[in-house]
């Protein structure tokens, strides 16, 4: 996981707990990579820019200059009582977009704007911000490896939207449900409400798509309500504790290595085995081999048994005479592995973009955004549609830090259109190099283009703090500060 750090030239380096995200150090990545602001009690605005560069890995520059607008556009409706903004997805990106709009609409400098001497908007603009999410709250995805192995920590990682002080504003409402379709021409979305099980039409003036990727367990919990999530965690923790024949983690990507080392840290007497089909861990990531090798070394040193170059071709359960269940795994070389519990961290993440029109997507289902985070110009009303986070096709490893940075851009640019549809002053993204931080037990292995591969407990403290980046993200978004108009 890794997190976002920003330095003004607008060079935002994102290193959130990778899990990117990816994560998981402000790997605001997933699967294990995230990017987050540095751990410090000093307000980020008062810190020297040098401290930002130290931990930021994604140079994304914010440019205050006009950007050519896509041709396929219709000016947003002007004198309406208030602008209607629909945000699809309430994770890192979605919440940052909502908070940015909330600040700007009330004539405040956005909380994510670290420009020196930044000026507030010239006037307030009434808005109604609707956030639609399948879950009933914000889940700290970066913390999944620990949350699914610790009931105490799990309780901290999921906060119902109704319990987040910063979002308790009349201008913001949350709908637990899913968006089934979006008509960009008419600006109407179809929303299936989880509570009523009814589909309703939602008209909007601006849309920000931040629904991310569909990921399986154990990358993310499958529960949609906090109470169900805690029950899901309890079940997994019980299985780990009672696995007399050890625990096997399948898949050596970011999620797999973080889960394996976290289990070893939390349950030091438990036998933990990590199986990966390739000869190197993190084989799917665009990272140097010295980073992959360093991760493998740390994993082994933690006490995890590492099996590389072997694929699990079959799994079967065996019932013992005492009623105990044992897993039998067969590898490609014919070797048999037995375990009391198996966690499969091999799953292909799929974009949750089925609700968007085909002309807005590439062949893999991602939105090929412009540097302004807007939809491609072939889409009707493209300038009023934005995509951020994992759903967007953009450079760099996907992580939460990048999603938060993109959210600030999308919300700011939407606000610019509200201020002046004819001459908006967009801020734009720049391509960024690969960056990742992995929380491996009490240590972390990180990679940035400027510092290369690093590891150690100090790196863990810098990228993840003491709670897998939870406090870093929570405080960065200022979620605990009650909203004041």
Predicted regions and their residues:
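Glycine-rich active-site loop/strand segments that organize a redox cofactor
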Residues: 122-155, 209-239, 447-448
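Beta1-alpha1 glycine-rich phosphate/pyrophosphate-binding loop at the start
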Residues: 67-175, 261-287
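C-terminal, flexible cofactor-proximal segment of oxidoreductases
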Residues: 72, 81, 177, 397-402, ...
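FAD-binding core/adjacent interface of flavoenzyme oxidoreductases
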Residues: 44, 50-59, 65-86, 168-248
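FAD-site-proximal beta/loop scaffold in flavoenzymes
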Residues: 226-244, 336-405
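Eukaryotic N-terminal targeting leaders
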Residues: 1-84, 106-126, 322, 482-485
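A Rossmann-like FAD-binding core segment of flavoenzymes
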Residues: 170, 174-177, 181-182, 269-371, ...
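Rossmann-like NAD(P)H-binding beta-loop-alpha module
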Residues: 243-271
């Amino acid at each position: 996981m890794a997190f976002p750090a920003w330095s003004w030239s607008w060079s935002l380096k994102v290193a959130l707990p990778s899990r990117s995200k990816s994560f998981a150090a402000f790997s605001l990545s997933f699967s294990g990579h995230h990017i987050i602001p540095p751990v410090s009690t000093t307000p980020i605005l008062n810190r020297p820019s040098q401290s930002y560069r130290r931990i930021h890995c994604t140079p994304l520059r914010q440019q205050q200059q006009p950007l050519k607008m896509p041709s396929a556009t219709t000016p947003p409706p002007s004198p309406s009582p208030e602008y209607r903004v629909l945000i699809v997805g309430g994770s890192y990106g979605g919440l940052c977009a909502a908070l940015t709009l909330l600040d700007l609409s009330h004539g405040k400098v956005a909380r994510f704007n670290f420009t020196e001497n930044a000026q507030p908007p010239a006037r307030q603009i009434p808005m109604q911000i609707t956030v639609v999410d399948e879950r009933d709250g914000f889940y700290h995805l970066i913390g999944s490896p620990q949350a699914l192995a610790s009931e105490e920590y799990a309780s901290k990682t999921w906060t119902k939207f109704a319990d987040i002080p910063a979002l308790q504003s009349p201008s913001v409402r949350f709908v637990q449900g899913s968006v089934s379709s979006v008509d960009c021409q008419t600006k109407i979305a179809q929303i299936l409400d989880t509570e009523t099980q009814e589909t309703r039409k939602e008209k909007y003036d601006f849309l920000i798509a931040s629904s991310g990727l569909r990921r399986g367990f154990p990358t993310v919990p499958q529960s949609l309500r906090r109470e169900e999530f805690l029950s899901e965690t309890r079940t997994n923790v019980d299985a780990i504790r009672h696995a007399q024949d050890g625990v096997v983690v399948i898949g050596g990507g970011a999620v797999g290595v973080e889960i394996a080392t976290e289990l070893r840290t939390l349950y030091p007497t438990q036998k933990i085995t990590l199986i990966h089909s390739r000869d190197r861990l993190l084989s799917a990531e665009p990272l140097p081999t010295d980073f992959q090798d360093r991760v493998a070394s740390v994993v082994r040193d933690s006490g995890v048994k590492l099996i590389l170059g072997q694929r699990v071709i079959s799994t079967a359960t065996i019932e013992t005479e005492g009623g105990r269940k044992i897993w039998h795994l067969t590898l490609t070389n014919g070797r048999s592995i037995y375990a009391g519990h198996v966690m499969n961290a091999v799953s292909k993440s799929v974009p949750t973009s089925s609700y968007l029109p085909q002309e807005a997507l590439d062949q893999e289902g991602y939105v090929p955004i412009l540097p302004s985070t807007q939809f491609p110009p072939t889409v009707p009303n493209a300038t009023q549609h934005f995509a951020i986070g994992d759903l967007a096709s953009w450079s760099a490893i996907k992580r939460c830090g990048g999603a938060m940075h993109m959210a600030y851009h999308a919300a700011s640019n939407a606000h610019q259109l509200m201020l002046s549809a004819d001459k908006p002053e967009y801020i734009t993204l720049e391509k960024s190099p690969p960056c990742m931080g992995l929380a491996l037990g009490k240590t972390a292995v990180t990679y940035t283009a400027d510092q290369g591969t690093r590891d150690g407990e100090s790196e863990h403290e810098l990228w993840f703090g003491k709670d897998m980046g939870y406090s870093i993200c929570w405080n960065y978004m200022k979620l605990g500060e009650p909203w004041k108009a």
